[in-house]
């Protein structure tokens, strides 16, 4: 920690002689540092690995031994991103991470499995850009993420930039239970959005629900303007939808959009939706009114070669194995 570079984010830094590293990937699996396995102890205490501390002292961690990784990469911003809101997304970084773009501090994150997203519209520029990240292996977050698995560090999921229009979606929520008779579906949709254009021109917020043949079975829309940032649509009843269960995973497609009053699409996105009700009655777990047994596994997202980075191909193999053995529940660890 004490020997870490402190000017790593500056443009004057020559990183041409720094070693390369695969991202996503844990640095201990690529020759930098030592993987540590402990069950419930903290790896920075003598019960785990470190010779420096005899017992934990939350929220503090050792300053004399705190391995730190520093990353830099140059990239060119796409030419068609003018007048758009630009975001940096780090989908999973293990350690206390500090993010910089073009020498300016963007933000920090500590949660290893939660995406960290930052608006960098005022920092990103045309042409060459430099992203720099410094990750400290230990922080107060280690007290919350102490679990029975390999303790390794670094960038474990994708890091990327993306652009959205100045009027864009920020979030949406979908609820799709069955009615009390487990016959018809109930569709509830709430959409959140923002207008960074500086203008109060009206636009239309809406959604469409499509079946597996892309046939529309429900829709709703409303016009908004001004400083409005959320629409909660009136719930709809979907007559006798194909229900979702682990054995019959029927799904519909929900398309959420923002449009100009003339119908031009500003932004649209989609997600899969299944109609189901999960509840506990008389100490019995029910799905769509039917009792089920939980047959599950723990999933640590671990690979002997790449650490906590798991490829999409390997994930698919894991799912195929689970289904082969009738697994219907997965606990992510």
Regions found by a protein language model. Give the residues of each.
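Extracellular recognition modules
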Residues: 132-134, 253-257
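Short beta-strand edge segments in extracellular beta-sheet folds
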Residues: 162, 223-225, 272-276
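Accessory beta-strand-rich segments of carbohydrate-active enzymes
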Residues: 1-4, 18, 26-29, 34, ...
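N-terminal carbohydrate-binding accessory modules
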Residues: 172-173, 255-324
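Exposed aromatic-hydrophobic patches
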Residues: 116-122, 229-239
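Short glycine/proline/serine/threonine-rich loop/turn segments at secondary-structure transition edges
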Residues: 81-85, 124-128, 237-251
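Short, solvent-exposed loop/linker segments at the N-terminal edge
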Residues: 176-185
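Beta-strand-rich binding/interaction modules
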Residues: 99-101, 184-223, 231-234
